[in-house]
Amino acid sequence: MLSVAILAAGKGTRMESSLPKVLHKISGKSLLQRVIDSCAELKPDKIFVITGHKSKEVQKSIPKDKKIHVVVQEPQSGTGHAIQVLCSEVKKHEGKLLVLNGDVPLIRPTTLKRLLYLHDSKNADVSLITTKKTNPHGYGRVFLNGDFIERIVEEKDCNELERENPLINAGVYCFNWGNLSEIINTLQSNNNQKEIYLTDTISLLKNSLSLEVEDNGELQGINNRIHLSECEECIQNSIKEKHMLNGVTFINKASCSISEEAEIGKDVIIEANTHIRGNTKINSHCIIGPNTFIENSNVGLQCEISNSTVYDSQVMDHIKIGPYSHIRPNSKISSYSKIGNFVEIKNSQLEEETKVNHLSYIGDSIIGRSTNIGAGTITANFDGQKKYQTKIGKNSSIGANTVFVAPINLGESVTTGAGSVITKDSKDNSLAISRTKQVNIENWKKKKS
């Protein structure tokens, strides 16, 4: 039986934030969620998330899962105290207990599996991950006696000689839970921090082993915004390298960010300052960017999107969008269409070969195929209380500066006169025009200021 305890109770004061440290995000996921995801790959029987500081806020972020249980640590008196609280709330202490911090977002499931294997194969009481750092400042130092761990001394309790030891405690432990539960309540806060250290269990358990791993960044704990940025960069480099090896070109990869869920086809070019978020799929032979943001959207084959934003929408094949277009949620732009500069599309469906080239707002609308929308066209869809739909049939030609006051339904091959305010439905093959007759007054004298 395997149980996991994730320590997520700390204040994270060095983050200088009102947000709990474990809720800060890297590439769209919180630190805590990343640790939960890594642990879930071990297929544990239970995952305990130990919260404390702003516990309710942290609990709201935890996914609903029968295997995940929340334990509240009050007050927060150290890592050893956290496990004391856990042991007091859980009646059966069976099998193995894996303990790790909620601020190590890069920890790999393969590394955790290696720790579990070492623990089982050596029948250890406790096994923990260690690594050597050229600058071990801030970490507890691990002292070995042959193959066994003799003791761990926290940074603030080290003397000058002990501080020279480069072998540090990564804060990832695997315990025989039964043996741990027998000694956990004997831990005391006899240290400079006046906290109960989990590391003090090492000297109380007989068979304590170390799994030394290479310092490759996966054990980096997040203590400040610099660490957060470094981990973000590490994850982003990994994501972008994967895509480049699969045939994607980044013009300036350092200026771009890509979500882990995103799918990008071959021969796609990602220009500078482009950000692809969420469950976005970009098919082959597209040019995306520069200065473009796409989130939770599907982009078809051979599309070009520049200096624009696309949210929760479908962009089909052979479409050009931008510059300075805004495609808002629940929109579908069908193939061979063109969305030009300063155009906003919201909750609308544009059929094939539709053009909206300039300075227009299309909201809550259905636009038929091969329709041309003139510059300055507005679908006035809101009466102050409710939103209404505009329908325009295929092969229509909408004059510049037309305003449609919804709800309204235009047939196929309809033409509207420039500057019209259309308030009534129009049949197929009709001209809709609504504007006052022009009056020219000769010899007009301007008013003097």
Swiss-Prot record:
Residues 247-449 are annotated as: N-acetyltransferase. Keywords: Acyltransferase, Cell shape, Cell wall biogenesis/degradation, Cytoplasm, Magnesium, Metal-binding, Multifunctional enzyme, Nucleotidyltransferase, Peptidoglycan synthesis, Repeat, Transferase. Acetyl-CoA binds at A375, A418, R435. Its cofactor is Mg(2+). One of its GO terms (cellular component) is cytoplasm. It comes from the Bacteria. The keyword Nucleotidyltransferase applies. Mg(2+) binds at D103, N223. Binds 1 Mg(2+) ion per subunit. The active site is at H358. Homotrimer. NCBIfam families: glmU, PRK14360.1. This is Bifunctional protein GlmU. It comes from Prochlorococcus marinus (strain AS9601).
